[in-house]
A protein has these predicted regions:
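Conserved donor-binding/catalytic core segment of Leloir-type glycosyltransferases
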Residues: 20-22, 189, 200-219, 225-228, ...
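Short alpha-helical donor nucleotide-sugar binding micro-motif in glycosyltransferases
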Residues: 93, 266, 274-279
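Aromatic "clamp/platform" in nucleotide-sugar-dependent glycosyltransferases that forms part
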Residues: 104, 287
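Membrane-proximal helix-turn-helix segments that form the acceptor-binding/catalytic region
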Residues: 118, 131, 144-162
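Nucleotide-activated donor-binding/catalytic signature segment of Leloir-type glycosyltransferases, i.e.
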Residues: 249-270
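Short hydrophobic beta-strand element within catalytic cores of glycosyltransferases
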Residues: 304-308
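Conserved acidic donor-binding segment of nucleotide-sugar-dependent glycosyltransferases
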Residues: 320-332, 342-346
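A charged, aromatic-enriched C-terminal amphipathic alpha-helix characteristic of glycosyltransferases
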Residues: 344-382, 388
């Protein structure tokens, strides 16, 4: 029997599916949402799809994409604005079978949706956000212009495509913020390296903490400094930041008077895995987030993580005894106290995180099959199957479907 939404033997033998991933960025910031593009590319190519990437041309002319559009980057945050390359956009979309538009807050993915509809192509629109408001961002850029962009650009584009959310929080957020129903796709984790050894913590050993992500207000890296500063009142600790963004200079200024703070800049995905695997724990201080890939990957590897309770973060702590390590955003005292609880019985909690990682990895492994299913052509409507588990949510045609 064949499963609706999943490729069958006859479909697997068919010609390669041509998938075009459209994203303003490919890998601009360590830990940024754009990491999905590279992940999706590798997973779909492993499933015999022919994948191309269309992106904005970065300053300097480089970019890890097959086709690039000339673009301006609007200060202060570098919002990408394509200013040319329309023939390239038209050609790339015309040659693809399926378009995956990545990110609802940028113009290029929305333009790709409009062109794809003109060219009668199937479009999947990947949502990364949780729908939570921007409480720490510029009033003019994020709250005023952002709202105008959502109403005039993002909402129409989402209604012309099939929205796909990489987080449970994003499903509810898409309904509340954009008025659309999104299909939930468990984040398709790539193969994660195992930590080389189980890290222990000696009584007088400095606690090594790693923070990975975009250095922007909504990620709140400045709070991480305050948290570790409070931890240091009880034991020695060091904090390393990996990422890029508009708060890099502010962190550098803080680091001048705090030799235990290091701002390392951006690194490759493989390098980040090594850094996280060598640390005692990873820290996330986001005030708004969705998938929380910056903690999902280390948690899936069994690495201890202290995080804020935003987006899907609470769901990543599968083992009940670990949920105390997920605290309210902005609560410096709670985060510091939780880190000290972790260090007081580090070996025991480390083993619990290892068990949690196995459960979390199994949960997100199915995201690979779901991603492949999304780009396959829908099966004929008369096909039926009894092999789908209750609660699965797959795709038929251009609309999500709930499987009873």
């Amino acid at each position: 029997m064949e499963t609706p939404g999943l490729p069958g033997p006859s479909e697997a033998a068919a010609a390669q599916r041509k998938v075009l991933l459209v994203s303003s960025f490919v890998l601009p910031h360590a830990g940024g949402v754009e990491q999905f593009v590279d992940t999706a590319k590798e997973l779909l190519r492993a499933r015999a799809c022919r994948v191309r990437i269309l992106a904005c041309r970065l300053p300097g002319g480089s970019g890890d994409a097959d086709a690039l559009l000339p673009s301006w980057f609007v200060p202060p945050g570098g919002w990408p604005l394509p200013v040319g390359g329309w023939r390239t956009l038209w050609r790339e979309i015309g040659e693809a079978d399926v378009i995956i538009a990545n990110g609802a807050r940028h113009l290029l993915p929305a333009l790709a949706v409009l062109v794809a509809r003109l060219r009668r192509k199937r479009v999947l629109f990947v949502l990364h956000g949780s729908g939570a408001p921007f409480t720490k961002s510029s009033f003019f850029y994020h709250r005023l212009l952002g709202s105008v962009f959502e109403w005039l650009v993002a909402r129409p584009a989402l209604r012309l495509s099939m929205p796909v959310s990489l987080s449970r929080a994003g499903v509810a957020g898409a309904r509340a913020r954009y008025g659309v129903e999104a299909t939930y796709l468990p984040y398709p984790l790539r193969e994660l390296p195992r930590p080389k050894r189980a890290r222990s913590l000696v009584a007088n050993e400095p606690l090594e903490i790693v923070w990975v992500g975009r250095l922007y207000p909504e990620k709140d890296p400045l709070s991480a400094v305050a948290v570790v500063e409070q931890v240091r009142r009880s034991r020695d600790a060091r904090l390393e930041f990996y990422g890029e963004g508009i708060l890099a200079d502010a962190l550098e200024r803080l680091a001048r008077d705090r030799p235990w703070v290091s701002v390392r800049g951006s690194r490759s995905w493989a390098q980040i895995q090594k850094v996280q695997g060598a640390a005692h724990l990873c820290l996330s201080t986001s005030s708004r987030d969705a998938t929380q890939i910056g903690i999902l990957e280390p948690l899936s590897r069994g690495i201890p993580v202290v995080s804020t309770r935003v987006g899907d973060a609470p769901r990543h702590y599968v083992v009940p005894g670990l949920r105390m390590f997920c605290v309210e955003p902005g609560d410096i005292d709670a985060a510091a106290a939780t880190i000290l609880v972790l260090t007081a019985a580090y070996d025991r909690h480390r083993d619990e995180f290892a068990a949690n990682g196995r459960l979390l990895k199994a949960r997100h492994r199915r995201g690979r099959a779901y991603l492949a299913a999304l780009v396959e052509p829908p099966p004929p409507p008369h096909r039926r199957s009894t092999s789908i588990r209750p609660g699965d949510r797959l795709v038929l045609g251009n609309q999500p479907t709930h499987v009873p």
